[in-house]
Amino acid sequence: MIKIGIICPSEIAFRRFMPALRKAEKDIVFAGIGYASPEEWFGDTSKVSLEAIREQQERESSKAKTFIDAYGGKIYRGYHALIESEDVDAIYLPLPPALHFKWAKMALENGKHVFVEKPSTTCLADTDELIRIASEKGLALHENYMFVFHDQLKAIDDVVARGEIGDVRLYRISFGFPRRAQNDFRYNKALGGGALLDAGGYTLKYADYLLGETAKVVTAQINYIPEFEVEMYGSATMVNDEGVTAQLAFGMDNDYKCEVEIWGSLGTIKANRILTAPEGFVPRYTIKKNQDVEPHELPADDSFLKSILRFVECVGNENERITNYKVLIRQATLVSDFRNAYESSNNK
């Protein structure tokens, strides 16, 4: 039985991770949650008022208590305390992206398996370093792009494989959402914010899934809005060795869109919520041939649960761990390739 602890009482941990974890309790159970100590939160506390420290501790400990009240387990005062606990086998890490490398590295060095929210880190070198440590210590490292485990992806694959829309001419993947609160970490450069690492990562991963291992980023564009220090929207083109193209668009100051369009020689598939379908959501897609549109409905699924179960597989099986390392490095490489393509086009 794997005992997993959570670093940081975050919203996604309470709303999504814990309900899914409860369904997997025959394989993995909740051990407890750590909230940041003053030193972990502020760094040097010598210039921080006692009132600010007290408010931070009360706020974070109160959040942690909501987990314990609902699910049991133990509260750890400090991320270090959780990571160093002998009662914990694995760590779930839902911190902002810029903090992933530091705390995932520390967890791995302390012999803990790591289940990290996407992106694994903010750069290829850091992801590579985490994989090196995990591999040396025989530990699982899993990045939570849960959408790839949803049954709707295979269902749409099957429609294409049956030839219902003929030969694929183009994939178009779009993921964007309206502007969030100004203090959201996504808009904070120091915390690893930016549309590429957030919405953009989804589109790159799904395009790679559709195009296969020969897919390459050939063009990339990111765009800024004056009042923000991070990129707010962007686009890319990916092509595989067969010449099939995927056009990607993403943003976090956009009208909401989360869809794939697969344009074939005989028809077109469109599906919504392809990257973000929550538990209980009933996926729908359409097949359009000329002016005729056929609606289709698929069963609901729980991709977060499946992502947790994939992590469990990696904990228990070396071959699965190695496969997962390759998945992580591929995603980090695609993000790096995107950045290189953008920089290359802007340096001409």
Describe the residue ranges of each PLM region.
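Short loop/edge segments at beta-strand edges and connector loops
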Residues: 77, 116, 143, 219-222, ...
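Predominantly a Rossmann-like dinucleotide-binding segment in NAD(P)-dependent oxidoreductases
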Residues: 12, 147-219, 224-227
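Beta-strand-loop-alpha-helix segment that lines the small-molecule cofactor/substrate pocket
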Residues: 89-90, 96-97, 101-148
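Contiguous beta-strand/loop segments that form the cofactor/metal-binding neighborhood of enzyme cores
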Residues: 205-278, 308-319
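N-terminal glycine-/serine-/threonine-rich beta1-alpha1-beta2 phosphate-ribose binding loop
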Residues: 1-110, 314
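C-terminal glycine/acidic-rich active-site capping loop/insertion
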Residues: 46-62, 146, 263-333, 347-348
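C-terminal helix-rich "cap/oligomerization" subdomain common to oxidoreductases
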Residues: 1, 6-7, 27, 35, ...
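Nucleotide donor/acceptor-binding cores
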Residues: 2, 139, 166-169
